[in-house]
Amino acid sequence: MGNDSSILADGSAMAVPGTSFNHTLFETALPPLPTFSLEVQPDLFPWVSDFWLNLLLPVVVYWVLSLTFHAIDVNDWFPQYRLHTPEEITKRNHVSRFEVARDVILQQIIQVVTGALLALSEPPEMIGKSEYDVAVWATRIRIAQRALPTVLGLVGLNATAISKSLLDTHPLLAGAVAGGYYPSLVGANSEPAFASWEMTLAKTIYYFLIPSVQYFIGAAIIDTWQYFLHRLMHVNKWLYVHFHSRHHRLYVPYAYGALYNHPVEGFLLDTLGAAVAFKVTRMTLRQGILFFSMSTIKTVDDHCGYAFPWDPLQIVTSNNAEYHDIHHQHWGIKTNFAQPFFTFWDTLLDTKYRGSKTNKPGQKKAKVEEKAQ
């Protein structure tokens, strides 16, 4: 293949007679794409299938983390970091711990059934194509380099002179400046090969950047879904009375009450929103395992009732336990709708709590600290 090449939608290289992709200094050929053979991906662990791991790990994570916070709570191990006193949990909450646990288990059953239907709607996940996909990205990187001589020319730089001056000391950089010209890089049968930096960048894009973007978009979808539906349930009196008011029986949140909801609300707000994020971002099943588990951890942490200074989830985002606790108080119930990851929508739509700091949980925490001393 010569420099008149492009990449098809499936990533394969194709010659296009009579056209060129930008101006290059030399006739260049694209390295060939490797062949691949697909096979069904084996399970991550021999003792449990990925199907069941995806369904059950978020439930296990929920209860392990919740019971850890519960142990801290009932043993009063870190009173200085409490948002509320133990007495408040007993006096102000309008639902028993048993009822909370019962309703959470019901929601998790609905969650598992929905997750099973979602997973069964997906085709079997295959492996064996990753090397090919990385090579496709490396090819795109090589083709993108063909624009460099033109770009440099636009700012008055001579790509030919620069490339020649770099050839002895930095041959790979010289090749990039020349528009992706690497005559010394050859593979089997004297075919063109990719530079090491091209492969490293391609692998970084494929294995890190793309999944990171998927996770970020997934989090943004969940935040958007939950913000507007959550806010609607406060604005619409009928929805609040019949569904969302159940969650607000917990004026003093605690960890395993994170998913204490009316079953209809739990399905619409939590389960369906996560399913939409999974589908839209086209995550793999294993990506879903991590995404759903991390979402569960964040949700539990936001309801834990503690403001630990060393908690990474409460450091990296302002949407934390103290932020959400404000929403559970009668003086903050019409604010702080955002959950579970960021506060973007509260900030943009001016629903972030801006009342007196004397009402905030920090005041409760100060009283607890005085009592502990």
Where are the model-predicted features located?
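Extreme N-terminal flexible tails
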Residues: 1-197
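Hydrophobic transmembrane alpha-helical segments that form the core helix bundle
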Residues: 115, 119-239, 253-320, 365
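Aromatic-acidic/polar surface patches that form glycan- and anion
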Residues: 53, 57, 214, 218, ...
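Cytosolic/stromal cytosol-facing helical appendages immediately following the last transmembrane segment
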Residues: 2-44, 48-52, 69-92, 235-373
